[in-house]
Amino acid sequence: MTRTRALASALITVAALLGAGAAPAAAQSSAAATSCYGGAKNLNYRYQEGPREYGPFTTSSRCGDINMRLTTDDQGFLYACVVFVDHTDKCNHDNKYSLHGTPWATVATEVKDGTRFVLRVGPYDTDAQNVNFQLAY
């Protein structure tokens, strides 16, 4: 009986320690997202034929990815890609654009600190006349 109580006590202690370790990890990832998005640049896209370039920008340790979201209320969409200007004049992901709306989404992932890039943005359709968006990198 004493052995069972000792084992139960040890299991409760381990569970408590594991639970305590999970909260700070969640808080750290939340804090990292806040600091990344907290430094976001506000930009504006006005409709034109073909893509428009923004930048150049240089990545920092604030974000591991290049992220984008639309902040205009009309639920529009924009196509976007990243061009790493010191290495190429083509978009990432085999020169393909990705579609972006109001939720934060990555345009490029796992980008090294100090990398120079431009953001290329184009309209999803002609409704994208005057679109505000944010860029976090």
Predicted regions span which residues?
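Post-signal peptide N-terminal regions of Sec-secreted extracellular proteins
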Residues: 28-137
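Secretory targeting and sorting signals
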Residues: 1-28
